[in-house]
From Swiss-Prot:
Belongs to the DASH complex SPC19 family. Component of the DASH complex consisting of ASK1, DAD1, DAD2, DAD3, DAD4, DAM1, DUO1, HSK3, SPC19 and SPC34, with a stoichiometry of one copy of each subunit per complex. Multiple DASH complexes oligomerize to form a ring that encircles spindle microtubules and organizes the rod-like NDC80 complexes of the outer kinetochore. DASH complex oligomerization strengthens microtubule attachments. On cytoplasmic microtubules, DASH complexes appear to form patches instead of rings. This is DASH complex subunit SPC19. The keyword Protein transport does not apply. The keyword Nucleus applies. It comes from Chaetomium thermophilum (strain DSM 1495 / CBS 144.50 / IMI 039719).
Length: 173
């Protein structure tokens, strides 16, 4: 009986090794065919395309291209015009920012104008103090003067912008 015992042990060990090898093979096969349903669907779709003649496909592509081509061109033109408009807007905003920066640098900390108009005429603020109504009128005149200067500067900026745009158009033409 002792002689049969080692042979049974060898048999059980061999059976366990075979079982492990079989489980490994099943796992490998499982991984190999896991994508099989999707692969079948893809291949079935390819077969459908193979059933349609090449001339029919070419005609359908040409028809589709003719149908949507003008719309694509229209969208591209719109996008190009929008980009040009945005570029002009950016240039205008840059010019306005430069103008505002120049204005800010012209004014001192107390709010009086040190700009191009300050040397003209007399400065009535230093001559004599004004009463209530005259002070109010002087303030209104100063505000109107500032508004007019701002308008002149803005118009000058617009003229410079138009000149730049005209130069760009002439260079492109």
């Amino acid at each position: 009986m002792s002689r049969q015992s080692p042979s049974y042990a060898d048999c059980v060990c061999s059976l366990r090794t075979s079982l492990a090898f079989l489980e490994s093979s099943v796992a490998t096969l499982d991984n190999g065919v896991q994508d099989f349903p999707r692969l079948c669907h893809v291949l079935r779709t390819v077969r459908h395309y193979e059933l349609i003649p090449q001339t029919t496909l070419a005609a359908a592509e040409a028809s589709l291209r003719d149908e949507i081509g003008p719309f694509i061109q229209l969208l591209l033109d719109r996008a190009e015009k929008h980009l040009d408009r945005q570029a002009r807007r950016i240039e205008t905003l840059k010019a306005r920012a430069e103008l505002n920066a120049g204005r800010l640098s012209q004014y001192s900390g107390d709010g009086h104008n040190n700009g191009k108009f300050s040397g003209q005429g007399m400065d009535f603020r230093k001559s004599r103090p004004l009463n209530g109504e005259a002070a109010l009128r002087a303030k209104v005149v100063r505000q109107r003067k500032e508004a007019l200067k701002y308008s002149v500067e803005r118009l000058e900026m617009e003229v410079r912008q138009k000149e730049r745009e005209l130069k760009l158009r002439l260079e492109q033409a």
